[in-house]
Amino acid sequence: MTRLTRRQALASLASVGAVALAGCTEGAGGGGGDGSGATVPAADARLPLPMEPAELREAAVSGGPDKDGIPSIDDPSFIGASEAGFLADGDPVFGVVRDGVAKAYPQKILAHHEIVNDELAGDPVSVTYCPLTGTVLGFDRGGTTFGVSGRLVNDNLIMYDRATETWWPQILATAVPGPWNAEPEVRSLREFRLVWTTWKRWRDQHPDTRVLSRDTGHPRNYARDPYGDYNPRDGYYAGGAPLFPPLREDDRYGPKRVVMGARAPEGAVAFLKDGLRDAGLLTGQLGDVPVLAVHDPRHDTGYVYRNPDEAAYEAVEGEVQGPSGTTHAPNALPLERVHTFDAMWFAWAGFYPETNVYE
């Protein structure tokens, strides 16, 4: 079967104004930032990188569209669950709850935009999605916004912030040099968890959820994902090789098998999502620290916790029983949680070749 390039996939939607593809030169569209003087909020500690920041710039490739050729949603609007008739029960959504307010971001909309600059409980945030690596991550953005650079590294979206025009590879969540800011401070973004689940699962748990509207200000056919489909799984998402060669290849698992990955300054760890689903609980090691991975059947997702004392926990009918006999929701164990997210195996292994993997 002929592999479809990212440019071809996106160009296939040109008839509905999907993406204006331009000639990609590395300096195109640069300009020293928006003049706001805003600072992107940074994490307390830097996350690990697979190579030197300058080497990551050298490894970056054009994804097809130029800077902002895939337009972020900068003025999102939301509707109620009863108005979201365009979503089928099995369609993926990316969910978050803050201060009692639930929001769902449909994957079929994010596939066309990759970034939504939004607010949660008054806090400015960016919801980011990379279709090629199957990753969704949330970041605090401070007084600026994030945009799509048009470049990829390890097939992963490289974002840029509009205040300083620094490059930020999504999975790494750490600044690297780019054509518009050659010497950024190397620091990591402040993250928050988004849950990759289905519309039905999210709606059942959060009937009052707000849903990102298709009224984005951009002419798009949101019924069509240029890469394939998740409901049922088809096209790029169904399997096969990534569009571009990954930084490193690891054939222990199929390239697009999904892992629940967690990384911290001390290292990275991954749990096969289907293995975690079957087991309910899995133990592993993040650097020198024992960790516990927990499956949450409510959303078919997973959480990873530091468990330095290796306390005994047990999955019991959708909850987790602790050593004292008390039960906890899978997302609320009395342990320190490590930021965890879904990722395609090739992308995780390419960025974190020394990762421990458990199934």
List each language-model region with its residue ranges.
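N-terminal secretory signal peptides and thylakoid transit peptides that target proteins
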Residues: M1-V16
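N-terminal Sec signal peptide cleavage junction
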Residues: G23-C24
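Mid-to-C-terminal functional-domain signal that highlights helix-capping/loop sites
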Residues: G29-E359
